[in-house]
Amino acid sequence: MQGNGSALPNASQPVLRGDGARPSWLASALACVLIFTIVVDILGNLLVILSVYRNKKLRNAGNIFVVSLAVADLVVAIYPYPLVLMSIFNNGWNLGYLHCQVSGFLMGLSVIGSIFNITGIAINRYCYICHSLKYDKLYSSKNSLCYVLLIWLLTLAAVLPNLRAGTLQYDPRIYSCTFAQSVSSAYTIAVVVFHFLVPMIIVIFCYLRIWILVLQVRQRVKPDRKPKLKPQDFRNFVTMFVVFVLFAICWAPLNFIGLAVASDPASMVPRIPEWLFVASYYMAYFNSCLNAIIYGLLNQNFRKEYRRIIVSLCTARVFFVDSSNDVADRVKWKPSPLMTNNNVVKVDSV
């Protein structure tokens, strides 16, 4: 799902340098983007995990996948991105073969883990709204943990072939050890199809079914019995949809470039502008810091918990405590249902 790279066979080889013809400001710009991404990624996703841990209103089956997605985003900020940053500062990779392979492997683990978790979230929302009578049984705490474990096992199975296929290589254009699209056309096409296009189709199907059902319910119910969809409920549903849309926008260019390269590597690689290739990569990198921002902007429960955690840190209070016992939160919280003649249609909260 990533770029056309240059081989780095072993740690004893000379350092691979970037293209000397590049403008001097480019490396600085890429470094600034990456530093911002790393800082926001780490702080934001730690806030997400702590928010779910502290607040009972956020501790539900759907948010198990949200925490799992936050972990996937954290993976790249903790190890691969700092190594890419060092490569930018050194104008080449001088960390050796092992770090290159581990960095590329963890990047793949993060992106595929992210898309599989986003798919899991979409399926969870679909079951919650379209099959609500079966939801509690399908998504018990035990089952939800099993689903998350399955997601990571599938992610691991999807990434491991990269180590044996020799597709993890250093690319000086992006200062990263990454998936080389030109090594095997068939393998690259398979990666894009099964690790991006198929999950995207599943997610689109789930969200389309949700919107269709909600619209049908609103049209069928008599005016005096028409269910009220609270603004907060609508925002909670839209939050995860926005997460999906931004992920698709950030990663689609890189995947379509991969398909183009795989179709005819010899002729397509020289025809892809370097600026487009680099921009598509760093746009994909940038996506890892967006989710926590989305939750804070669109979800009131997360926004309040972010504020509590920050205040706790600033006042040196212990923040590993259950904040849902606050006076304002003692009223029992329930998602408001949408009733139909033969089923219950609910709008879940993140």
Swiss-Prot record:
Belongs to the G-protein coupled receptor 1 family. GO terms for molecular function: G protein-coupled receptor activity; hormone binding; melatonin receptor activity. Coiled coil: none annotated. The chain crosses the membrane at residues 30-50, 64-84, 103-123, 143-163, 188-208, 241-261, 275-295. Keywords: Cell membrane, Disulfide bond, G-protein coupled receptor, Glycoprotein, Membrane, Receptor, Transducer, Transmembrane, Transmembrane helix. Glycans are attached at N4, N10. It is a multi-pass membrane protein. Residues 51-63, 124-142, 209-240, 296-350 are cytoplasmic. GO terms for biological process: adenylate cyclase-inhibiting G protein-coupled receptor signaling pathway; circadian rhythm; G protein-coupled receptor signaling pathway; G protein-coupled receptor signaling pathway, coupled to cyclic nucleotide second messenger; mating behavior. Signal peptide: none annotated. Expressed in hypophyseal pars tuberalis and hypothalamic suprachiasmatic nuclei (SCN). Hippocampus. Residues 1-29, 85-102, 164-187, 262-274 are extracellular. It is found in: Cell membrane. GO terms for cellular component: plasma membrane; receptor complex. Changing R54W: Exhibits significantly reduced B(max) and slightly enhanced affinity. SMART domains: 7TM_GPCR_Srsx. It holds the Pfam family 7tm_1. InterPro entries: GPCR_Rhodpsn, GPCR_Rhodpsn_7TM, Mel_1A/1B_rcpt, Melatonin_rcpt. High affinity receptor for melatonin. Likely to mediate the reproductive and circadian actions of melatonin. The activity of this receptor is mediated by pertussis toxin sensitive G proteins that inhibit adenylate cyclase activity. Possibly involved in sleep induction, by melatonin activation of the potassium channel KCNMA1/BK and the dissociation of G-beta and G-gamma subunits, thereby decreasing synaptic transmission. This is Melatonin receptor type 1A. Its main location: membrane. Melatonin binds at N162, Q181. Disulfide bonds join C100-C177.
